[in-house]
Amino acid sequence: RLGLSNDKKIKSDARAEATLNVLHGALHNSHRPLSHQTMFEWQAALFPTGRSGMHKIVTGAYRVHAEPMQIVTPRLDKPDVVHYQAPASEDVQHHMEIFVHWFNTSLRQQDGLVRAALAHLWFETIHPFEDGNGRIGRALVEMALAQDLKTEQRLWSLSQQIWQDRGSYYEQLQTATSRANMDVTPWVQWFVSCIHKAADSSWEQMQSAMRSEE
């Protein structure tokens, strides 16, 4: 027995467990200011072996590689399609200083849902880590929403909703990061609608559970 399918399941379970731990940590630390160290710990927790697949990566720190950080669609017969190129690694610390300051000072100054949407987009635009940016970005959303609602309880699963709508998510993210006029209104509208869908889905699940107990 080679156990290949079982190995794959173990890896999948380990990835899911690591992601859930980070999301849980974001919720339960929502009463504290966001810090670079917090995000370093989140990202390191996602890659406990220091590898992403077969590749060794920098963990617990922002990226430092000289190569451009690009979001691409690989193609076998043609050049890769570059959807977005993030700031150079040497500029990441500066961009993240601004981001962290904004995140910690914008609470109560902006609508909570809008703030969560902007936080996710801004973070993904910087793409500060070698890997794990999407999951860290979702953890920031969980933290922002918990701060706005003043609760550490997960009332809905936004990560699951984004995963279900991932095609639309990547399309909206690409559109938002490529707008020359920096108009992020369509992104915010889409993101808020995604939160509403997640809330509706959670409500339906609770209603179904209550009916099954009657």
Region roles according to the model:
Residues 1-214:
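FIC/Doc superfamily catalytic core
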